[in-house]
């Protein structure tokens, strides 16, 4: 029952309009500094690192990562549908399905949004010019001529941190329910 429950949550989230809008909002937010400050970064790797070091953008993106699951959870909470789900399955299956759905959806929103941003940045700038010394431990990918691997790893790590914040939001909303 747990896998089917999780699968139904994932179908609901992936078919929702807010999931796809959140991905595009993440990409647009990440691309702001390329539009307003086109000379601030020299290549795509530098553009991603600049994004990850700007506090305002780094704080907004986890909100977009939490939107799809939060909307689904709020809809379920308001309609009290979780009572019948828990009655048909059990609390452990329900909590596991909610947790995994939150993790997967928030990771995908952030990661796919960053991939869209990287694609846009790649259209604007070269991939990697070797203009700065790579930072350990992942800079080895840049030294070995694999900048895409470096970009994927750094994007994955940032997406995991956004997932952590989404999970904190889920935990807080489960302990302190708000009807608004």
Describe the role of every protein-language-model region.
Residues 1-4, 76, 162-164:
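Short hydrophobic/aromatic segments of transmembrane alpha-helices and their interfaces
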Residues 72-105:
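Helix-loop-helix units of permease transmembrane domains in multi-pass membrane transporters
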Residues 28-71, 96-174:
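Secretory targeting signals
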Residues 76, 174-175:
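Helix-to-coil boundary motifs at intracellular loop junctions of multi-pass secondary transporters
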Residues 1-22:
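Aromatic- and glycine-rich beta-strand/loop motifs that create alpha-glucan
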Residues 21-22, 176-180:
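Pore- or pathway-lining transmembrane helices of multi-pass membrane proteins that form conduits
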